[in-house]
Amino acid sequence: MASSVDEEALHQLYLWVDNIPLSRPKRNLSRDFSDGVLVAEVIKFYFPKMVEMHNYVPANSLQQKLSNWGHLNRKVLKRLNFSVPDDVMRKIAQCAPGVVELVLIPLRQRLEERQRRRKQGAGSLQELAPQDGSGYMDVGVSQKARGEGVPDPQGGGQLSWDRPPAPRPPAYNRALQGDPSFVLQIAEKEQELLASQETVQVLQMKVRRLEHLLQLKNVRIEDLSRRLQQAERKQR
């Protein structure tokens, strides 16, 4: 979530977020990041002077969430040459599943790229120690490494297994680079796919119900036919 980010990319994203100290327990990515506060904390973790946390108010209301995201877009993301379109911000604020991931993945790449440029010649980044407690990897996310090359969350290079990385379609690469139009298209296509899957499931249930009713009718017809034959024999 290519029309969605694949499992390995999500796996790496959750590992990355789990290694960043955040002010809230980590339960559900779409809800946790919906008001923009944790996104500001992630950026502040990399660049403390870039973010003033008092500008971001934890919120449940859509209006305040959009206000937080708007301020983050204008004052912080702009300095990273990064932007989240208004319609994508609204989807994130509404906790639409699978949308915030499409922002966090390219944002992570932008943060690590900028940090590498600032630390050129200073050696590799210091390894982040995993936090105690639960994280996104502990709340039902079970992924399998596919043997593909994935971005190294510490050095920005490639982690490789036995097999070389599979080639990515151009649309997938453009989405991971933060192309706003592709971010929105991917989010919309994912929602359409989920809706289609739900429709198929409902139709399958209806088919099974009709098959069951047909079986009951056949049994009833056989029973009535048998009784009719018995009555005819008695009359003779």
UniProtKB/Swiss-Prot annotation:
<dbReference type="InterPro" id="IPR010441">
    <property type="entry name" value="CH_2"/>
</dbReference>
<dbReference type="GO" id="GO:0030027">
    <property type="term" value="C:lamellipodium"/>
</dbReference>
<protein>
    <recommendedName>
        <fullName>Sperm flagellar protein 1</fullName>
    </recommendedName>
</protein>
<dbReference type="GO" id="GO:0097542">
    <property type="term" value="C:ciliary tip"/>
</dbReference>
<dbReference type="GO" id="GO:0016323">
    <property type="term" value="C:basolateral plasma membrane"/>
</dbReference>
<dbReference type="GO" id="GO:0001578">
    <property type="term" value="P:microtubule bundle formation"/>
</dbReference>
<comment type="subunit">
    <text>Homodimer. Interacts with actin, TJP1, CGN and CDH1.</text>
</comment>
<dbReference type="GO" id="GO:0003341">
    <property type="term" value="P:cilium movement"/>
</dbReference>
<dbReference type="InterPro" id="IPR036872">
    <property type="entry name" value="CH_dom_sf"/>
</dbReference>
<keyword id="KW-0493">Microtubule</keyword>
<dbReference type="GO" id="GO:0007026">
    <property type="term" value="P:negative regulation of microtubule depolymerization"/>
</dbReference>
<dbReference type="GO" id="GO:0008017">
    <property type="term" value="F:microtubule binding"/>
</dbReference>
<dbReference type="GO" id="GO:0003779">
    <property type="term" value="F:actin binding"/>
</dbReference>
<feature type="domain" description="Calponin-homology (CH)">
    <location>
        <begin position="7"/>
        <end position="112"/>
    </location>
</feature>
<comment type="function">
    <text>Microtubule-associated protein involved in the stabilization of microtubules along the axis of migration during radial intercalation. Promotes the establishment and stabilization of an axis of microtubules required for the active migration of cells into the outer epithelium. Microtubule-associated protein that promotes microtubule bundling and stabilizes microtubules against depolymerization in response to cold shock.</text>
</comment>
<dbReference type="GO" id="GO:1904158">
    <property type="term" value="P:axonemal central apparatus assembly"/>
</dbReference>
<keyword id="KW-0963">Cytoplasm</keyword>
<dbReference type="GO" id="GO:0051493">
    <property type="term" value="P:regulation of cytoskeleton organization"/>
</dbReference>
<dbReference type="GO" id="GO:0046847">
    <property type="term" value="P:filopodium assembly"/>
</dbReference>
<dbReference type="GO" id="GO:0001725">
    <property type="term" value="C:stress fiber"/>
</dbReference>
<dbReference type="GO" id="GO:0005737">
    <property type="term" value="C:cytoplasm"/>
</dbReference>
<feature type="region of interest" description="Essential for homodimerization and microtubule bundling activity">
    <location>
        <begin position="183"/>
        <end position="236"/>
    </location>
</feature>
<dbReference type="GO" id="GO:0016324">
    <property type="term" value="C:apical plasma membrane"/>
</dbReference>
<dbReference type="GO" id="GO:0005902">
    <property type="term" value="C:microvillus"/>
</dbReference>
<feature type="region of interest" description="Disordered">
    <location>
        <begin position="115"/>
        <end position="176"/>
    </location>
</feature>
<dbReference type="GO" id="GO:0097729">
    <property type="term" value="C:9+2 motile cilium"/>
</dbReference>
<dbReference type="GO" id="GO:0030175">
    <property type="term" value="C:filopodium"/>
</dbReference>
<dbReference type="GO" id="GO:1990716">
    <property type="term" value="C:axonemal central apparatus"/>
</dbReference>
<dbReference type="GO" id="GO:2000095">
    <property type="term" value="P:regulation of Wnt signaling pathway, planar cell polarity pathway"/>
</dbReference>
<keyword id="KW-0472">Membrane</keyword>
<dbReference type="InterPro" id="IPR052111">
    <property type="entry name" value="Spermatogenesis_Ciliary_MAP"/>
</dbReference>
<keyword id="KW-0282">Flagellum</keyword>
<dbReference type="GO" id="GO:0016477">
    <property type="term" value="P:cell migration"/>
</dbReference>
<keyword id="KW-0966">Cell projection</keyword>
<dbReference type="InterPro" id="IPR001715">
    <property type="entry name" value="CH_dom"/>
</dbReference>
<keyword id="KW-0969">Cilium</keyword>
<dbReference type="GO" id="GO:0005930">
    <property type="term" value="C:axoneme"/>
</dbReference>
<keyword id="KW-0009">Actin-binding</keyword>
<dbReference type="GO" id="GO:0005874">
    <property type="term" value="C:microtubule"/>
</dbReference>
<keyword id="KW-0970">Cilium biogenesis/degradation</keyword>
<keyword id="KW-1003">Cell membrane</keyword>
<dbReference type="GO" id="GO:0030032">
    <property type="term" value="P:lamellipodium assembly"/>
</dbReference>
